[in-house]
Amino acid sequence: MGSYLNPGCKGFEESLNSAIYVDKTGLIEKVNAVVDTRQKYICVSRPRRFGKSMATDMLAAYYDQSVDTARLFDTLQIAKAETYQKYRNQYDVLKVNMQEFLSMTHSMDEMLAVFQKRMIADLKRGYPDYVMDGEDSLVFAMKDVYAHTKCPFIILI
C-alpha cells in the first residue's frame, strides 16, 4: 500500500527466492503467542548482519492485511502452527527503518518530527477518509483509523 503502511510481501518474497534461505517462520509463532496479550511489546535485538531486516520483512508479509500471503507461508514451518490462519493477514502493519530517519536529520527532535509527519502522510494516503486534514499527531491518526476499521496495528521498527 504505502512506504510504511502495509508494505506488502516484496521484501520477504525476495528472501524466499534467494539461493540461500533458512526458514525462520518459527519466530511468527512466538509473536502470535503474545500478540493479543499484555506482553505484546517485543524487542528483538541482534548485532548487525543478523537478519533483523529479513525478520521484519517476514513479519510484515505475514501480518499485512492488504495482501494474501498464503502462497508464501503455506509450505513453511509456521503453516503447521495452530495459530497460522488466525493471525495471517489480519492487521494494518507499520514497518519502519529508523536508520532512514536518523540519517536524514541532525537532531532527535527533528528526527521525531520527520518520522511523525511521514507516518501520518502514509496513513492519510491509505485511509484518506479517516485521517483528518492537518492532523499532526500520529497517535490520533492511528486511533482515527482504528476507530473506523477496527483493524489493529502491528508496528515493526
Predicted segments with their positions:
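Phosphate-binding site recognition
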Residues: 1-157
